[in-house]
Amino acid sequence: DYHVFSTDDVMHGEIVDHGVVLKVEDIAWAGRQLWDCDVAFKNGKYYMYFPMKDQNDIFRMGVAISDRPEGPFIPQSDPMKGSYSIDPAVFCDDDGSHYMYFGGIWGGQLQRYRDNKAIENPCLPADNEPALPGRVVKLRDDMLEFAEAPRAVLVLDEHGEPLKAGDPHRFFEASWMHKYNGKYYLSYSTGDTHFLCYAIGDNPYGPFTYQGVILTPVVGWTTHHAIVEYKGKWYLFHHDCVPSGGKTWLRSLKVVELEYDAEGKIITIDGGGE
């Protein structure tokens, strides 16, 4: 089930739980497992993008629509054409165009695809090979389908080479995009190495040059996140497992103010883990 929380004071305000806004039983093409979702706004409507396994146990992206941010959200009858993997994050650029960033390896099934087509014998690259990239795709004006074929999101080192699969700062899952001082900040989770990292580019498609760590490891393996500007300040939303004693399936929402230095670099935040 998905819930919506709201507050008007990010650091100190009361949190309101608006209850269940979408559940598996509501979705016609459902198999099982709703994973991390995102919501975008356009023309008075709220569009929730969610990954879910279909009846063949393959992840697809779905869309559900509401007139209000607190829901309820009504799902479309079919998944988005050409969609796969997990962790959709939708970014609205200054010209009103919307882009979805998505993908996750291991259980997120990204390794099952090459050039947007399923392959018969999926495998992960060797440590000395380029890491599997996430994906980005422009959305159609109606927000319900892809406007084009998804593209690879390249994260490059200082020499212009793709980060290797054995690099602890390579992409794993949980893409996010925000814009600061005219630059595009791609952030993501490194999964099994437990960092939130970021890279900067000049346009929504990249390529993006690796910059550093946003958040050091937290308690538990749970570093999905969002970066949001609200009332003139920037915030990092993430989660950890402190209240559950480190049980990774029992996650608690966290927020911390995010700051930049004079050059636009994000100041690293201590996650409090090992």
Where are these regions (language model features)?
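Carbohydrate-active catalytic/glycan-binding domains of CAZyme proteins
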Residues: D1-E274
